[in-house]
Amino acid sequence: MVEHIDTSLIDWSRAQFALTAIYHWIFVPLTLGLAVIMGLMETIYYRTGNDFWRRTAKFWMKLFGINFAIGVATGLILEFEFGTNWSNYSWFVGDIFGAPLAIEGILAFFMEATFIAVMFFGWNKVSKGFHLASTWLTGLGATISAWWILVANAWMQYPVGMAFNPDTARNEMVDFLAVATSPMAVNKFFHTVLSGWVLGAIFVVGVSCWYLWKRRDKQFALSSVKVAAWVGLVAAVLSAWTGDGSAYQVAQKQPMKLAAMEGYYDGQEGAGLVAFGILNPQKQTPDDGVDPFLMRIEIPKMLSLLGERDADAFIPGINDLLEGGYTLKDGSTALSAEEKIARGQMAITAFAKYRKAKAEGNDEEAQVARQTLTENMPYFGYGYIKDANELVPNVPLTFYMFRVMVILGGYFILFFLVVLFLAYKRNLSKLRWMHMVALWTIPLGYIAGQAGWAVAECGRQPWAIQDMLPVSAAISKLDTGSVQLTFFLFLILFTILLIAEIGIMLKAIRKGVEH
Protein backbone atom coordinates (compact mmCIF):
# COMPACT_ATOMS: atom_id res chain seq x y z
CA MET A 1 0.00 0.00 0.00
CA VAL A 2 2.84 2.37 0.85
CA GLU A 3 6.19 2.37 -0.90
CA HIS A 4 9.46 2.39 1.02
CA ILE A 5 10.38 5.96 1.90
CA ASP A 6 13.78 7.25 2.97
CA THR A 7 13.97 7.86 6.72
CA SER A 8 15.57 11.26 6.19
CA LEU A 9 12.41 12.39 4.39
CA ILE A 10 10.34 11.17 7.34
CA ASP A 11 12.54 13.03 9.81
CA TRP A 12 12.48 16.28 7.84
CA SER A 13 8.72 16.10 7.29
CA ARG A 14 8.18 15.50 11.00
CA ALA A 15 10.53 18.38 11.82
CA GLN A 16 8.65 20.72 9.48
CA PHE A 17 5.27 19.82 10.95
CA ALA A 18 6.63 20.12 14.49
CA LEU A 19 8.11 23.53 13.67
CA THR A 20 4.78 24.78 12.34
CA ALA A 21 2.82 23.35 15.28
CA ILE A 22 5.23 24.81 17.86
CA TYR A 23 5.02 28.29 16.36
CA HIS A 24 1.24 28.05 15.98
CA TRP A 25 0.84 27.09 19.63
CA ILE A 26 2.71 30.21 20.69
CA PHE A 27 -0.32 32.24 19.58
CA VAL A 28 -3.36 30.02 20.20
CA PRO A 29 -3.37 29.81 24.02
CA LEU A 30 -2.95 33.56 24.41
CA THR A 31 -5.94 34.06 22.11
CA LEU A 32 -8.06 31.73 24.25
CA GLY A 33 -6.94 33.33 27.51
CA LEU A 34 -7.23 36.98 26.53
CA ALA A 35 -10.70 36.34 25.07
CA VAL A 36 -12.05 35.41 28.50
CA ILE A 37 -10.27 38.18 30.39
CA MET A 38 -11.25 41.01 28.04
CA GLY A 39 -14.80 39.60 27.95
CA LEU A 40 -15.01 39.81 31.74
CA MET A 41 -13.63 43.35 31.72
CA GLU A 42 -16.18 44.52 29.16
CA THR A 43 -18.92 42.79 31.16
CA ILE A 44 -17.90 44.85 34.19
CA TYR A 45 -18.09 47.98 32.00
CA TYR A 46 -21.55 46.96 30.75
CA ARG A 47 -22.85 46.41 34.28
CA THR A 48 -21.25 49.45 35.96
CA GLY A 49 -21.07 51.98 33.14
CA ASN A 50 -17.59 52.94 34.41
CA ASP A 51 -15.60 54.11 31.38
CA PHE A 52 -12.39 52.95 33.06
CA TRP A 53 -13.35 49.33 32.32
CA ARG A 54 -14.10 50.16 28.68
CA ARG A 55 -10.60 51.58 28.26
CA THR A 56 -9.09 48.62 30.11
CA ALA A 57 -10.94 46.10 27.93
CA LYS A 58 -9.95 47.99 24.75
CA PHE A 59 -6.28 47.83 25.69
CA TRP A 60 -6.28 44.04 26.07
CA MET A 61 -8.38 43.74 22.91
CA LYS A 62 -5.61 45.49 21.02
CA LEU A 63 -3.08 42.87 22.14
CA PHE A 64 -5.62 40.13 21.43
CA GLY A 65 -6.01 41.35 17.84
CA ILE A 66 -2.26 41.42 17.20
CA ASN A 67 -1.88 37.88 18.50
CA PHE A 68 -4.99 36.60 16.72
CA ALA A 69 -3.81 37.74 13.29
CA ILE A 70 -0.45 35.97 13.53
CA GLY A 71 -2.11 32.83 14.91
CA VAL A 72 -4.43 32.60 11.91
CA ALA A 73 -1.48 32.83 9.49
CA THR A 74 0.44 29.98 11.11
CA GLY A 75 -2.71 27.86 11.48
CA LEU A 76 -3.50 28.00 7.76
CA ILE A 77 -0.03 26.72 6.89
CA LEU A 78 -0.41 23.89 9.40
CA GLU A 79 -3.61 22.62 7.78
CA PHE A 80 -2.12 22.74 4.28
CA GLU A 81 0.75 20.51 5.40
CA PHE A 82 -1.62 17.57 5.82
CA GLY A 83 -2.13 17.52 2.07
CA THR A 84 1.38 18.39 0.98
CA ASN A 85 3.58 16.38 3.37
CA TRP A 86 1.18 13.74 4.65
CA SER A 87 -0.85 12.71 1.60
CA ASN A 88 -1.05 9.01 2.54
CA TYR A 89 -2.49 10.06 5.89
CA SER A 90 -4.96 12.41 4.20
CA TRP A 91 -6.08 9.69 1.79
CA PHE A 92 -6.35 6.98 4.44
CA VAL A 93 -8.41 8.94 6.98
CA GLY A 94 -9.33 12.20 5.24
CA ASP A 95 -13.06 11.40 5.35
CA ILE A 96 -12.90 11.39 9.15
CA PHE A 97 -10.13 13.83 9.97
CA GLY A 98 -11.37 16.40 7.45
CA ALA A 99 -14.88 16.63 8.91
CA PRO A 100 -14.03 18.41 12.19
CA LEU A 101 -11.56 20.66 10.39
CA ALA A 102 -14.24 21.61 7.85
CA ILE A 103 -16.72 22.38 10.63
CA GLU A 104 -14.04 24.45 12.37
CA GLY A 105 -13.49 26.49 9.21
CA ILE A 106 -17.15 26.96 8.30
CA LEU A 107 -18.57 27.59 11.76
CA ALA A 108 -15.91 28.77 14.17
CA PHE A 109 -13.60 30.72 11.87
CA PHE A 110 -16.44 32.64 10.22
CA MET A 111 -17.93 33.38 13.64
CA GLU A 112 -14.61 34.82 14.76
CA ALA A 113 -14.12 36.75 11.51
CA THR A 114 -17.60 38.29 11.73
CA PHE A 115 -17.70 39.35 15.35
CA ILE A 116 -14.07 40.40 15.71
CA ALA A 117 -14.83 43.24 13.28
CA VAL A 118 -17.72 44.42 15.46
CA MET A 119 -15.56 44.06 18.56
CA PHE A 120 -12.80 46.30 17.17
CA PHE A 121 -14.76 48.82 15.12
CA GLY A 122 -18.18 48.78 16.76
CA TRP A 123 -17.46 51.03 19.74
CA ASN A 124 -20.04 53.86 19.75
CA LYS A 125 -21.56 52.40 16.55
CA VAL A 126 -23.59 49.55 18.04
CA SER A 127 -25.31 49.23 21.39
CA LYS A 128 -23.29 48.30 24.48
CA GLY A 129 -25.13 45.00 24.73
CA PHE A 130 -24.49 44.04 21.11
CA HIS A 131 -20.83 44.98 21.42
CA LEU A 132 -20.49 42.90 24.57
CA ALA A 133 -22.14 39.96 22.80
CA SER A 134 -19.71 40.38 19.90
CA THR A 135 -16.74 40.27 22.25
CA TRP A 136 -17.94 37.06 23.90
CA LEU A 137 -18.88 35.52 20.54
CA THR A 138 -15.38 36.24 19.24
CA GLY A 139 -13.96 34.33 22.19
CA LEU A 140 -16.59 31.62 21.77
CA GLY A 141 -15.61 31.26 18.12
CA ALA A 142 -11.97 30.78 19.10
CA THR A 143 -13.02 28.19 21.68
CA ILE A 144 -15.24 26.32 19.21
CA SER A 145 -12.35 26.37 16.77
CA ALA A 146 -10.17 24.77 19.43
CA TRP A 147 -12.86 22.16 20.10
CA TRP A 148 -12.98 20.86 16.53
CA ILE A 149 -9.22 20.92 16.08
CA LEU A 150 -8.79 19.01 19.34
CA VAL A 151 -11.49 16.54 18.28
CA ALA A 152 -9.38 15.82 15.20
CA ASN A 153 -6.23 15.45 17.28
CA ALA A 154 -7.96 13.26 19.86
CA TRP A 155 -9.18 10.98 17.08
CA MET A 156 -5.56 10.43 16.07
CA GLN A 157 -4.83 9.41 19.66
CA TYR A 158 -7.94 7.22 19.97
CA PRO A 159 -9.56 6.42 16.59
CA VAL A 160 -13.28 5.65 16.94
CA GLY A 161 -16.46 5.91 14.88
CA MET A 162 -15.02 4.65 11.59
CA ALA A 163 -14.80 1.55 9.40
CA PHE A 164 -12.20 0.64 6.78
CA ASN A 165 -13.54 0.30 3.23
CA PRO A 166 -11.17 -1.97 1.26
CA ASP A 167 -12.78 -0.93 -2.03
CA THR A 168 -11.63 2.67 -1.62
CA ALA A 169 -8.66 1.99 0.69
CA ARG A 170 -10.04 4.62 3.04
CA ASN A 171 -11.44 4.76 6.53
CA GLU A 172 -14.97 6.12 6.47
CA MET A 173 -16.91 7.73 9.29
CA VAL A 174 -19.83 5.66 10.59
CA ASP A 175 -20.52 7.46 13.88
CA PHE A 176 -19.92 11.21 13.92
CA LEU A 177 -21.08 11.54 17.52
CA ALA A 178 -18.49 8.99 18.68
CA VAL A 179 -15.76 11.01 16.97
CA ALA A 180 -16.99 14.38 18.27
CA THR A 181 -17.59 13.33 21.87
CA SER A 182 -14.98 10.67 22.56
CA PRO A 183 -13.69 10.79 26.16
CA MET A 184 -10.21 11.54 24.81
CA ALA A 185 -11.56 14.59 22.95
CA VAL A 186 -13.56 15.90 25.91
CA ASN A 187 -10.64 15.70 28.33
CA LYS A 188 -8.18 17.08 25.80
CA PHE A 189 -10.45 20.03 25.04
CA PHE A 190 -10.97 21.13 28.63
CA HIS A 191 -7.34 20.59 29.61
CA THR A 192 -6.02 22.48 26.58
CA VAL A 193 -8.45 25.40 26.72
CA LEU A 194 -7.98 25.84 30.46
CA SER A 195 -4.21 25.88 29.95
CA GLY A 196 -4.80 28.69 27.45
CA TRP A 197 -6.72 30.62 30.10
CA VAL A 198 -3.79 30.11 32.47
CA LEU A 199 -1.36 31.52 29.92
CA GLY A 200 -3.62 34.47 29.16
CA ALA A 201 -3.85 35.25 32.88
CA ILE A 202 -0.08 34.98 33.31
CA PHE A 203 0.41 37.33 30.37
CA VAL A 204 -1.99 39.94 31.74
CA VAL A 205 -0.50 39.75 35.25
CA GLY A 206 3.03 39.99 33.86
CA VAL A 207 2.33 42.97 31.60
CA SER A 208 0.39 44.71 34.38
CA CYS A 209 3.30 44.21 36.77
CA TRP A 210 5.55 45.85 34.18
CA TYR A 211 3.38 48.97 34.50
CA LEU A 212 3.70 48.78 38.28
CA TRP A 213 7.48 48.39 37.90
CA LYS A 214 7.49 51.53 35.75
CA ARG A 215 5.10 53.26 38.17
CA ARG A 216 2.58 53.84 35.37
CA ASP A 217 -1.20 53.39 35.18
CA LYS A 218 -1.44 51.97 38.68
CA GLN A 219 -5.24 51.65 38.79
CA PHE A 220 -5.34 49.97 35.37
CA ALA A 221 -2.55 47.57 36.30
CA LEU A 222 -3.94 46.55 39.70
CA SER A 223 -7.46 46.08 38.33
CA SER A 224 -6.14 43.96 35.46
CA VAL A 225 -4.06 41.88 37.88
CA LYS A 226 -7.08 41.10 40.05
CA VAL A 227 -9.31 40.01 37.15
CA ALA A 228 -6.57 37.97 35.49
CA ALA A 229 -5.34 36.31 38.68
CA TRP A 230 -8.82 35.07 39.55
CA VAL A 231 -9.23 33.67 36.04
CA GLY A 232 -5.77 32.12 36.24
CA LEU A 233 -6.30 30.52 39.64
CA VAL A 234 -9.61 28.93 38.69
CA ALA A 235 -8.21 27.77 35.34
CA ALA A 236 -5.00 26.38 36.87
CA VAL A 237 -6.91 24.33 39.45
CA LEU A 238 -9.37 23.03 36.85
CA SER A 239 -6.49 22.33 34.45
CA ALA A 240 -4.87 20.10 37.07
CA TRP A 241 -8.18 18.29 37.55
CA THR A 242 -8.72 17.76 33.81
CA GLY A 243 -5.08 16.72 33.52
CA ASP A 244 -5.88 13.85 35.85
CA GLY A 245 -8.72 12.87 33.50
CA SER A 246 -6.40 13.08 30.50
CA ALA A 247 -3.85 10.86 32.24
CA TYR A 248 -6.57 8.30 32.93
CA GLN A 249 -7.54 8.28 29.25
CA VAL A 250 -3.89 7.82 28.28
CA ALA A 251 -3.63 4.85 30.65
CA GLN A 252 -6.71 3.27 29.06
CA LYS A 253 -6.03 4.00 25.40
CA GLN A 254 -2.25 4.61 25.10
CA PRO A 255 -0.49 2.51 27.76
CA MET A 256 2.88 2.80 26.00
CA LYS A 257 2.70 6.58 26.32
CA LEU A 258 1.92 6.28 30.02
CA ALA A 259 4.88 3.93 30.49
CA ALA A 260 7.17 6.42 28.71
CA MET A 261 5.83 9.29 30.83
CA GLU A 262 6.95 7.36 33.92
CA GLY A 263 10.10 5.69 32.58
CA TYR A 264 8.27 2.52 33.56
CA TYR A 265 9.67 -0.70 32.07
CA ASP A 266 8.43 -3.58 34.23
CA GLY A 267 4.79 -3.68 35.23
CA GLN A 268 3.50 -4.37 38.70
CA GLU A 269 0.43 -4.16 40.88
CA GLY A 270 0.20 -1.08 43.05
CA ALA A 271 2.61 0.83 40.80
CA GLY A 272 4.15 4.00 42.21
CA LEU A 273 4.28 7.41 40.51
CA VAL A 274 7.74 8.93 40.05
CA ALA A 275 7.59 12.27 41.86
CA PHE A 276 11.22 13.01 41.02
CA GLY A 277 13.71 10.99 39.04
CA ILE A 278 16.83 11.09 36.91
CA LEU A 279 16.91 8.64 34.01
CA ASN A 280 19.99 6.55 33.33
CA PRO A 281 21.50 7.68 29.99
CA GLN A 282 23.04 4.20 29.61
CA LYS A 283 19.56 2.73 29.11
CA GLN A 284 19.35 2.15 25.36
CA THR A 285 16.78 -0.62 24.80
CA PRO A 286 13.96 -1.99 26.95
CA ASP A 287 15.57 -5.41 27.41
CA ASP A 288 19.22 -4.41 27.93
CA GLY A 289 19.09 -5.08 31.69
CA VAL A 290 20.24 -1.56 32.60
CA ASP A 291 18.42 0.12 35.50
CA PRO A 292 16.33 2.91 33.91
CA PHE A 293 16.95 5.35 36.79
CA LEU A 294 20.01 6.81 38.44
CA MET A 295 17.71 7.87 41.26
CA ARG A 296 13.99 8.31 41.84
CA ILE A 297 11.46 9.19 44.51
CA GLU A 298 8.09 7.48 44.17
CA ILE A 299 4.63 8.09 45.56
CA PRO A 300 3.50 4.54 46.42
CA LYS A 301 0.58 3.11 44.42
CA MET A 302 -0.20 6.50 42.88
CA LEU A 303 0.31 5.39 39.25
CA SER A 304 -2.18 2.54 39.69
CA LEU A 305 -4.63 4.96 41.28
CA LEU A 306 -4.10 7.48 38.48
CA GLY A 307 -4.29 4.98 35.63
CA GLU A 308 -6.95 2.55 36.85
CA ARG A 309 -8.64 4.31 39.80
CA ASP A 310 -7.50 1.32 41.87
CA ALA A 311 -4.44 1.54 44.13
CA ASP A 312 -3.68 -2.17 43.67
CA ALA A 313 -4.29 -2.42 39.91
CA PHE A 314 -1.66 -3.81 37.54
CA ILE A 315 -0.03 -1.22 35.27
CA PRO A 316 1.94 -2.71 32.35
CA GLY A 317 5.42 -1.37 31.68
CA ILE A 318 7.24 -1.04 28.38
CA ASN A 319 8.56 -4.61 28.51
CA ASP A 320 5.10 -5.98 29.33
CA LEU A 321 3.59 -4.12 26.39
CA LEU A 322 6.26 -5.51 24.06
CA GLU A 323 6.21 -9.07 25.38
CA GLY A 324 2.47 -9.40 26.12
CA GLY A 325 1.15 -12.25 28.22
CA TYR A 326 -0.48 -10.21 30.98
CA THR A 327 -4.25 -10.23 31.57
CA LEU A 328 -6.30 -7.37 30.15
CA LYS A 329 -9.34 -5.87 31.89
CA ASP A 330 -11.71 -7.91 29.71
CA GLY A 331 -10.02 -11.13 30.81
CA SER A 332 -8.17 -11.77 27.55
CA THR A 333 -4.40 -12.12 27.28
CA ALA A 334 -2.39 -9.23 25.87
CA LEU A 335 -0.67 -9.99 22.58
CA SER A 336 3.05 -9.46 22.18
CA ALA A 337 4.34 -6.78 19.83
CA GLU A 338 5.67 -9.49 17.51
CA GLU A 339 2.22 -11.09 17.30
CA LYS A 340 0.62 -7.72 16.55
CA ILE A 341 3.21 -7.08 13.83
CA ALA A 342 2.52 -10.52 12.33
CA ARG A 343 -1.23 -9.90 12.33
CA GLY A 344 -0.71 -6.47 10.82
CA GLN A 345 1.29 -8.01 8.00
CA MET A 346 -1.52 -10.54 7.50
CA ALA A 347 -3.98 -7.64 7.22
CA ILE A 348 -1.84 -5.83 4.64
CA THR A 349 -1.37 -9.03 2.62
CA ALA A 350 -5.09 -9.80 2.79
CA PHE A 351 -5.89 -6.27 1.62
CA ALA A 352 -3.60 -6.68 -1.41
CA LYS A 353 -5.19 -10.07 -2.21
CA TYR A 354 -8.66 -8.58 -1.90
CA ARG A 355 -7.86 -5.76 -4.31
CA LYS A 356 -6.34 -8.19 -6.80
CA ALA A 357 -9.26 -10.63 -6.56
CA LYS A 358 -11.80 -7.83 -7.04
CA ALA A 359 -9.92 -6.59 -10.09
CA GLU A 360 -9.95 -10.11 -11.56
CA GLY A 361 -13.62 -10.64 -10.72
CA ASN A 362 -12.86 -13.51 -8.33
CA ASP A 363 -15.57 -12.89 -5.73
CA GLU A 364 -14.91 -16.07 -3.75
CA GLU A 365 -11.24 -15.30 -3.19
CA ALA A 366 -12.10 -11.67 -2.47
CA GLN A 367 -14.54 -12.77 0.24
CA VAL A 368 -11.91 -14.96 1.92
CA ALA A 369 -9.34 -12.15 1.79
CA ARG A 370 -11.84 -9.64 3.17
CA GLN A 371 -12.64 -11.92 6.09
CA THR A 372 -8.93 -12.21 6.92
CA LEU A 373 -8.56 -8.45 6.60
CA THR A 374 -11.51 -7.78 8.92
CA GLU A 375 -10.18 -10.17 11.58
CA ASN A 376 -6.74 -8.54 11.60
CA MET A 377 -7.69 -4.91 10.86
CA PRO A 378 -7.18 -3.76 14.50
CA TYR A 379 -3.46 -4.49 13.96
CA PHE A 380 -3.21 -3.07 10.43
CA GLY A 381 -0.75 -0.35 11.37
CA TYR A 382 1.61 -2.81 13.07
CA GLY A 383 2.25 -4.38 9.67
CA TYR A 384 4.46 -1.41 8.78
CA ILE A 385 6.61 -1.80 11.90
CA LYS A 386 9.92 -3.55 11.21
CA ASP A 387 11.19 -3.92 14.78
CA ALA A 388 9.18 -4.14 17.99
CA ASN A 389 11.46 -1.57 19.64
CA GLU A 390 10.11 1.00 17.17
CA LEU A 391 6.92 0.94 19.24
CA VAL A 392 8.73 2.57 22.17
CA PRO A 393 8.64 6.40 22.04
CA ASN A 394 11.47 8.65 23.15
CA VAL A 395 11.37 7.88 26.87
CA PRO A 396 13.68 10.67 28.17
CA LEU A 397 11.86 13.37 26.19
CA THR A 398 8.41 12.17 27.26
CA PHE A 399 9.46 11.60 30.88
CA TYR A 400 11.08 15.00 31.42
CA MET A 401 8.52 17.03 29.46
CA PHE A 402 5.73 15.50 31.53
CA ARG A 403 7.46 16.64 34.70
CA VAL A 404 8.13 20.11 33.33
CA MET A 405 4.41 20.45 32.59
CA VAL A 406 3.28 19.14 36.00
CA ILE A 407 5.81 21.14 38.04
CA LEU A 408 4.96 24.36 36.22
CA GLY A 409 1.24 23.64 36.63
CA GLY A 410 1.74 23.44 40.39
CA TYR A 411 3.86 26.60 40.34
CA PHE A 412 1.12 28.51 38.51
CA ILE A 413 -1.45 27.69 41.20
CA LEU A 414 0.96 28.98 43.85
CA PHE A 415 1.80 32.02 41.71
CA PHE A 416 -1.83 33.11 41.37
CA LEU A 417 -2.49 32.56 45.07
CA VAL A 418 0.46 34.79 45.98
CA VAL A 419 -0.53 37.45 43.43
CA LEU A 420 -4.10 37.60 44.75
CA PHE A 421 -2.91 37.80 48.36
CA LEU A 422 -0.51 40.63 47.56
CA ALA A 423 -3.06 42.45 45.38
CA TYR A 424 -5.74 42.44 48.10
CA LYS A 425 -3.78 42.35 51.37
CA ARG A 426 -0.51 44.09 50.53
CA ASN A 427 0.58 46.98 48.32
CA LEU A 428 1.51 45.02 45.18
CA SER A 429 2.48 48.22 43.39
CA LYS A 430 5.53 48.62 45.66
CA LEU A 431 6.75 44.99 45.64
CA ARG A 432 9.30 45.20 42.86
CA TRP A 433 10.54 41.65 43.42
CA MET A 434 7.05 40.39 42.63
CA HIS A 435 6.94 42.46 39.47
CA MET A 436 10.06 40.64 38.25
CA VAL A 437 8.65 37.24 39.24
CA ALA A 438 5.50 37.99 37.23
CA LEU A 439 7.49 39.06 34.18
CA TRP A 440 9.67 35.94 34.28
CA THR A 441 6.58 33.76 34.68
CA ILE A 442 5.34 34.75 31.20
CA PRO A 443 7.84 32.53 29.30
CA LEU A 444 7.17 29.71 31.78
CA GLY A 445 3.54 29.70 30.65
CA TYR A 446 4.64 29.09 27.08
CA ILE A 447 7.13 26.42 28.13
CA ALA A 448 4.42 24.53 30.03
CA GLY A 449 2.14 24.49 26.99
CA GLN A 450 4.86 23.31 24.63
CA ALA A 451 5.90 20.62 27.13
CA GLY A 452 2.33 19.34 27.27
CA TRP A 453 2.17 18.99 23.50
CA ALA A 454 5.57 17.28 23.46
CA VAL A 455 4.16 14.64 25.82
CA ALA A 456 0.98 14.26 23.76
CA GLU A 457 2.67 13.96 20.37
CA CYS A 458 6.12 12.51 21.02
CA GLY A 459 4.68 10.09 23.56
CA ARG A 460 2.52 8.37 20.93
CA GLN A 461 5.28 7.76 18.44
CA PRO A 462 5.66 5.91 16.10
CA TRP A 463 1.96 6.42 15.40
CA ALA A 464 0.33 9.10 13.27
CA ILE A 465 -2.94 7.37 14.19
CA GLN A 466 -2.74 5.15 17.25
CA ASP A 467 -2.33 1.46 16.25
CA MET A 468 -3.65 2.22 12.76
CA LEU A 469 -1.05 4.15 10.79
CA PRO A 470 2.59 4.79 11.71
CA VAL A 471 4.27 8.03 10.73
CA SER A 472 6.49 6.20 8.23
CA ALA A 473 3.41 5.10 6.26
CA ALA A 474 1.55 8.42 6.49
CA ILE A 475 4.01 10.53 4.58
CA SER A 476 4.01 11.96 1.04
CA LYS A 477 6.66 10.74 -1.36
CA LEU A 478 8.55 13.99 -1.85
CA ASP A 479 12.08 15.03 -2.61
CA THR A 480 13.90 15.37 0.71
CA GLY A 481 15.64 18.52 -0.50
CA SER A 482 12.32 20.29 -1.13
CA VAL A 483 11.16 19.51 2.41
CA GLN A 484 14.46 20.79 3.80
CA LEU A 485 14.09 23.99 1.77
CA THR A 486 10.54 24.66 2.95
CA PHE A 487 11.56 23.84 6.52
CA PHE A 488 14.09 26.66 6.55
CA LEU A 489 11.76 28.99 4.63
CA PHE A 490 9.07 28.41 7.25
CA LEU A 491 11.61 28.84 10.03
CA ILE A 492 12.58 32.25 8.64
CA LEU A 493 8.95 33.26 7.96
CA PHE A 494 7.66 32.20 11.37
CA THR A 495 10.57 33.86 13.14
CA ILE A 496 9.87 37.10 11.28
CA LEU A 497 6.18 36.86 12.23
CA LEU A 498 7.08 36.19 15.87
CA ILE A 499 9.52 39.10 15.99
CA ALA A 500 6.91 41.31 14.33
CA GLU A 501 4.27 40.33 16.88
CA ILE A 502 6.59 40.91 19.82
CA GLY A 503 7.64 44.27 18.38
CA ILE A 504 4.08 45.44 17.74
CA MET A 505 2.95 44.24 21.15
CA LEU A 506 5.82 45.97 22.94
CA LYS A 507 4.99 49.19 21.10
CA ALA A 508 1.35 48.92 22.17
CA ILE A 509 2.34 48.10 25.76
CA ARG A 510 4.75 51.04 25.96
CA LYS A 511 2.01 53.33 24.63
CA GLY A 512 -0.28 52.10 27.38
CA VAL A 513 -3.99 52.40 27.99
CA GLU A 514 -5.85 55.38 26.53
CA HIS A 515 -6.85 58.16 28.91
Q: What residues fall within each predicted segment?
A:
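Polytopic transmembrane helical bundles with strong interfacial aromatic enrichment
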Residues: 2-515
